[in-house]
Amino acid sequence: MNIKSLLLGSAAALIAVSGARAADAVVVAEPEPAEYVKICDVYGSGYFYIPGTETCLRIGGYVRYDIGAGDVGSFDGARSFDHKDGDEQDTFYKNARFTLKTWTGQETELGTLKTYTETRFNFGNRNGYPSADDPTTEADEFNSNPAGNKNVSLNFAWIQLGGLRVGKDESAFDTFIGYAGNVLQDTLVPYGDFDTNVVQYYFDAGNGFSAVVSLEEGSGTVGTIDSYVPHVVGGLKYTQGWGAITGVVAYDSNYEEVAGKVRLDITPMQNLSLFIMGGYGTDDNLNDDTTLIHNGNAINAGGRGFYKQWGGNWAFWGGGTYTINEKTSFNAQVSYDEWKNLGVAANIAYDVVPGFTVTAEVDYLNAGKFDDANFSNFTDADKKSSIGGLLRFQRSF
């Protein structure tokens, strides 16, 4: 046997052994094709089918950061105590918010079944004043209006089948007729409270006419119903290409008062939208004469109910939005009520990139009856004229 034969034989033996070991190796199974989420475009963009169901789901929300300065009465400022000498002084009002939203939709034999939820998480200080020391105690109890986590709020959580909606919503007194413009502080003169549980029915005739009837629980000390009798809201709207005319009427079952609003929206140009809204409400049972014994309400409403929150019987709001270009818009609002409260708000909103908007706003409030004994302070103003500004950064998704 020569060396060549020996080498060939050794190589053959090695190949045989390797083949035997390869035959004993574990065979890795081919990965099964992944089942990707299916897009649902029935209800708009962003929806997808929940796997194994016919329900479409969308998840969204926004992250927001507000920086405010100025007077507390403008809703933009804050006050604090100096940590060294205890003097009260101005400071920034700051608030960071994360809002989570969900939408679902599914077609059924009774119509579209929809849900909507919105939950808000906030961190910051308050648009308010520091807490003064309690002279009845020996301990120093200065509260300098510190920043911190605030209460989580459930702003929406409703179910709707066809035109029937039940759950947590905002009052149809506001949602059906529309809010008071695209300014950030649109309630310098308030136009109605918001949070409530509802049982409501919405009807769309398909020819521009729509209507709503809403049974509402209200919220807060003044607004929450005190019996089995709900608050009632009714509304009627006519919408066309030029704009819309809307009216709403509300019955406050706690104080047995009625309030209503009428609104006109017009679009005179493609890049300009304008609105004017007027409100009127009865308030005999909302005004408390605390100077007379047994001549006031058990719960003092201060002239402002759940629906008629403006001062006096009447109020109006007007404003609009002018789109300067595809990234920039100008928004303004003016409001006034019978108690001589004048609110003015204006801002510039700029879309830095799609989904990220920066808004700079200036707000002014003149509380005409500030010096009167019966002045009802809605914005917590500490003087007749308040002015402030707010800078908002918001990433929506």
Task: Specify the residue positions occupied by each region the protein language model found.
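Outer membrane beta-barrel
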Residues: 46-69, 79, 83, 87-220, ...
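Detector for outer-membrane/organellar transmembrane beta-barrel domains
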Residues: 234-345
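Hydrophobic, lipid-facing positions within transmembrane beta-strands of outer-membrane proteins
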Residues: 96-100, 152-157, 195-199, 230-234, ...
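Transmembrane beta-barrel strands of outer-membrane/channel proteins
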Residues: 63-69, 117-121, 166-170, 213-217, ...
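Solvent-exposed loop segments that connect transmembrane elements
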Residues: 75-84, 128-146, 220-227, 281-313, ...
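N-terminal periplasmic/intermembrane-space "pro-region" immediately following the signal or transit peptide
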Residues: 1-64
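Outer-membrane beta-barrel "beta-signal"
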Residues: 350-352, 364, 383-397
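Repeated loop/turn-to-beta-strand initiation elements of outer-membrane beta-barrel proteins
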Residues: 109-112, 163-166, 207-213, 242-247, ...
